[in-house]
Amino acid sequence: MTDPIQKPEGLKLWLMAARAYSFPASIIPVLLGSVLAVLLNPGLQFNFINFALTLIGCILVQVGTNIINDIFDFDKGIDKEDKELGIPHGGSMVISLGFLSIKQMKTAAFVSLLISFLIGVYLFTQSGMWILYLSIFGLLSAIFYTAKPLALKYKALGDIQVIL
C-alpha cells in the first residue's frame, strides 16, 4: 500500500490535469516542421509570431484532448485505484482522486480548445485555407479521441489518430 497522493495546488494542479509530461508530443512536431520549412525554403521569412502561436495552439489542443480523455475514462471507470496494488492508474487521476471536479475539467477543456480554435482562425487569416483544414481536423481529433460517436481510443485507433 502506498501513501496517499498529496493534492497539488495552483499551477501544479493544472499542469497535472493537463499532463504536461506529454507536451513533447506536440512541441517536437512543430519544431521539426518549422526547421524543415526554413531549410527547404531558403528565401522564406521565418515568422516567429506564427511559430509561437502554432506551438501554443498545438499544446492547447493536446491539453484539451488529455482533459477530455480523463473525463471519458473516469465516466467509463477506466481511471481508478488498482484495488490489489492500492495505487491509482490512468490519465492524470485528478478527477478520481477528487482534486478537480468534472465541471472544472469540462471548463478547462472548453477553454483550451476555444483558445486553440481562435489561434487557428488567426493563422488561417495569415496562411490560407490549408491551415483551416488542419485546425478543424485537430479540433475534431481532440474531441473524438475518446468522445462518442467515434471514441477512437477504445477501438485501438487512438494511436493512429495521434500519429496523424
PLM region descriptions:
Residues T65-V111:
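Aspartate-rich (DDxxD/NDxxD/DxxxD) Mg2+/diphosphate-binding motifs
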Residues D3-G10, I87, S96, P149-L152:
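Juxtamembrane loop-helix boundary motifs flanking transmembrane segments in multi-pass membrane proteins
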Residues W14, D70, D159-I160:
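Residue-level recognition of specific faces of alpha-helices
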Residues V38-P42, D70, F74-I78, T125-M129, ...:
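Transmembrane helix-loop junctions in multipass membrane proteins, especially transporters and channels
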Residues M1-I49, L53, G57:
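Topogenic membrane-insertion module of multi-pass membrane proteins
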Residues L31, G43-I68, Y133-F137, S141-I143:
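Membrane-embedded alpha-helical segments that form the functional core of polytopic membrane enzymes
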Residues G91-L164:
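Intramembrane alpha-helical segments
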